[in-house]
C-alpha cells in the first residue's frame, strides 16, 4: 500500500508512527489503524505482550527511542502520534519529526478522526468511565451491532481494549484528566459523575468542573447527554445543559427519571436490580454478573446510551446480564484457602469507598467474613490533597493495609507518604513501606471466608497473585 491512501482512513493517518505505542490507549489506536488498512510503526521503552501482538498484526515496532525510528515505514510517516502525559517534548523522535515538518498529533485527536463517519458514544466522568463504556460495548455487541471501540481496560469477553467494527457506531472513553475529551464531538455523551480530581493539571475545582460544560457543549445538534443525577456535580451539569436546549436523559435512584434504580441486592458476586424506564409503565428486572450498587448505576447509563444508538431494550438487558467486567475493575483474581482476592483500579476516595462497599456486599454472603483493603496511593499530589477523604473511605473496611505512594510521573513531596493516609484511618490499619513484605503480612491476618481487595493505579495489581500464593503456603 506504499504511496496509496487506505480508503477508510484520512490522508494524514495513512502512515503513522506512534511514540509510546505500548501504552494501553496508544496500542488500542494502533490496532484500529491497522485494521482499517493503515501502516503503523512505533517505539516504546520496553517490550511487552501487547507489542508482540501489534507486530503480529503488521506493525513495525522498535524498543528504545531514536530519530531513525521515523524511517521504519516506506515513504516515512504522514503523522507522528504521542500522548500528553507519558512522552516528553524532548523525545528524540518528536524532535526529529518537528525538524522534518511531520505533523505531531495527540492520541485523542487521532481517535476523534477515526469517529468521523460513525455515530459516536463517548463516556466521561470522574469515576466509572471504563466500566460504563465497556457495558455499552457488550450490550451493543449482544444486540447484533459490531461497534468500533476504544476503552481504558481490557473487556473480559473481548480480551482487548480496542476494535475496528463493521458497524456504524463508535464507543469510547473520553479522558477528562488532561482536557483531551474536548477533541470529541459526540452524538451521545454519558457523564457518570463529577467530583474534584486532577487538580495537579486544572489547578482549581472550578476549572475541572468547567471542562465538562465545554464537553457537553460539543454534543452534536441532534445528540443527547445521558447523566447520573445521583451525583450532585453531574446533576448540576444536567440542569445547565438542559438550559442550553440540549436533550438530557437522566438516570439514578429518584422516581420519574428516564431510568431509575428502584431496588438492588447482591447475589453472590453478581446482583439483581429492579428498574423502571420512563418510556414504559412497568418495572423490569436487570441482572448483572458484577457486584456493587455503583455498577448497577453504571448499567443504567449504559442502557440509556445503547438505546439511543438504536438498540432494543430487552436485548440490551440480556447483554448487560452477561457483562463479566473489565480488567482491574473489581476483578476476581482468585481464591485460596477460602479467601477471595479482588483487584480494583480505585485511586480516588469515592472509588475506594465504592470498591469496599462492593467487597462488603460479597463478604455478607458468608457469615463471619471480614473485608480487608490493601491500598496503594497514586501520586503525591493526590495523596496530599485527599488524605483525609482516603482515610475515611478506607475506614469502612474491617482491616486496612496502606502501601507507600506510587509516584508515577511525580517527584516526592516533603512529608507526604502512605503514612499520611494511614494515620487517619479509624479501622485497624498497617502502613507498609516495603512493597515486598505486603503479601505475607496480608496472608498472615486472613482466614477462610475473608475477602481482600487490592486498590490503586500502580503496581499494587501485582499483589493479588502473591497474596493467594502466601495463603496457599500457609494452608
Swiss-Prot record:
Top-rank lineage group of the source organism: Bacteria
Binding site residues for ATP: 125-131
Which biological pathway?
Cell wall biogenesis; peptidoglycan biosynthesis
- Name any GO cellular component annotation: cytoplasm
Q: Which UniProt keywords apply?
A: ATP-binding, Cell cycle, Cell division, Cell shape, Cell wall biogenesis/degradation, Cytoplasm, Ligase, Nucleotide-binding, Peptidoglycan synthesis
Write out the annotated subcellular location. Answer: Cytoplasm
* HAMAP family given in the database record: MurC
Summary of the function given for this chain in its UniProt record:
Cell wall formation.
Its family remark reads: Belongs to the MurCDEF family.
According to UniProt, the name of this protein is UDP-N-acetylmuramate--L-alanine ligase
> What does the organism's lineage look like at the top?
Bacteria, Bacillati, Actinomycetota, Actinomycetes, Mycobacteriales
Amino acid at each position: 500500500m506504499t504511496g496509496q491512501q487506505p480508503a477508510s482512513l484520512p490522508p494524514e493517518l495513512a502512515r503513522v508512527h506512534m511514540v509510546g505505542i505500548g501504552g494501553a490507549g496508544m496500542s488500542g489506536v494502533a490496532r484500529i489503524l491497522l485494521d482499517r488498512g493503515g501502516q503503523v510503526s512505533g517505539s516504546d521503552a520496553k517490550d511487552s505482550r501487547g507489542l508482540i501482538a501489534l507486530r503480529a498484526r503488521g506493525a513495525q515496532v522498535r524498543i528504545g527511542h531514536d530519530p531513525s525510528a521515523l524511517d521504519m515505514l516506506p515513504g516515512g510517516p504522514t503523522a507522528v502520534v504521542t500522548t500528553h502525559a507519558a512522552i516528553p517534548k524532548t523525545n528524540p523522535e518528536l524532535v526529529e519529526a518537528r525538524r522534518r515538518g511531520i505533523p505531531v498529533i495527540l492520541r485523542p485527536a487521532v481517535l476523534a478522526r477515526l469517529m468521523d463517519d460513525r455515530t459516536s458514544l463517548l463516556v466521561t466522568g470522574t469515576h466509572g468511565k471504563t466500566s460504563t463504556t465497556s457495558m455499552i460495548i457488550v450490550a451493543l455487541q449482544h444486540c447484533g451491532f459490531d461497534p468500533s471501540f476504544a476503552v481504558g481496560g481490557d473487556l473480559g469477553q473481548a480480551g482487548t481494549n480496542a476494535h475496528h467494527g463493521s458497524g456504524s457506531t463508535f464507543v469510547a472513553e473520553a479522558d477528562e484528566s488532561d482536557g483531551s475529551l474536548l477533541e470529541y464531538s459526540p452524538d451521545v455523551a454519558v457523564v457518570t459523575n463529577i467530583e474534584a480530581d486532577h487538580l495537579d493539571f486544572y489547578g482549581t475545582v472550578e476549572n475541572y468542573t468547567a471542562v465538562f460544560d465545554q464537553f457537553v457543549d460539543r454534543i452534536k445538534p441532534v445528540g443527547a447527554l445521558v447523566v447520573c443525577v445521583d451525583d450532585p456535580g453531574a446533576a448540576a451539569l444536567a440542569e445547565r445543559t438542559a438550559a442550553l436546549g440540549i436533550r438530557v436523559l437522566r438516570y439514578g435512584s429518584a422516581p420519574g427519571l428516564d431510568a431509575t434504580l428502584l431496588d438492588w441486592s447482591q447475589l453472590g458476586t453478581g446482583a439483581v436490580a429492579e428498574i423502571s424506564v420512563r418510556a414504559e409503565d412497568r418495572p423490569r428486572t436487570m441482572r448483572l454478573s458484577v457486584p456493587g450498587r455503583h455498577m448497577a448505576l453504571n448499567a443504567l447509563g449504559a442502557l440509556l446510551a445503547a438505546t439511543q444508538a438504536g438498540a432494543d431494550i430487552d436485548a440490551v438487558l440480556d447483554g448487560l446480564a452477561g457483562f463479566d467486567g473489565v480488567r482491574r475493575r473489581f476483578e476476581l483474581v482468585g481464591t485460596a484457602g477460602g479467601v477471595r482476592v479482588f483487584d480494583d483500579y480505585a485511586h480516588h476516595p469515592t472509588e475506594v469507598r465504592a470498591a469496599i462497599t462492593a467487597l462488603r456486599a460479597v463478604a455478607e454472603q458468608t457469615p463471619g467474613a471480614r473485608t480487608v483493603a490493601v491500598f496503594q496511593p497514586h501520586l503525591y499530589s493526590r495523596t496530599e490533597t485527599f488524605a483525609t477523604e482516603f482515610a475515611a473511605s478506607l475506614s469502612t473496611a474491617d482491616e486496612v493495609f496502606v502501601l507507600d505512594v506510587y509516584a508515577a510521573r511525580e517527584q516526592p513531596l516533603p512529608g507526604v507518604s502512605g503514612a499520611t493516609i494511614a494515620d487517619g484511618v479509624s479501622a485497624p490499619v498497617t502502613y507498609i513501606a516495603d512493597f515486598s513484605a505486603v503479601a505475607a503480612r496480608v496472608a498472615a491476618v486472613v482466614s477462610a471466608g475473608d475477602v481482600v481487595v487490592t486498590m490503586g493505579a500502580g503496581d499494587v495489581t501485582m499483589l493479588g497473585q502473591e497474596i493467594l500464593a502466601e495463603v496457599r503456603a500457609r494452608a
